[in-house]
Amino acid sequence: MDPLVRIKRAILAGRYAFSEKARLEMEADGLIELDVAESIVNAVAIYKRLRSRSSRPTVRREYLYVIYGSTLAGLMVYSKGKFVRENGEEVYYFLVSSKKAR
């Protein structure tokens, strides 16, 4: 299944969480969780997929997805996140970074 579809479904189902860094960026830019969720649901494509190494020894590599999308009010938001798996199953989408697009 397309990663953007999987991300949007996780967001719509409320299966997402924010890192402390993402929360600080959101606060600095005056964004709320709904702004970030709207921007992801309204996104038309994934801007970039980054391969990264996980700090967990059981996970060899993971992908970070960079998404630019707009809120219903027209504000462009940048977000970067990854899927978190537990027992081999995608549990939720974890947002590492969320801020106004520059």
Residue ranges with predicted function:
Residues 1-102:
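Ribonuclease/tRNase effector modules and their secretory precursors
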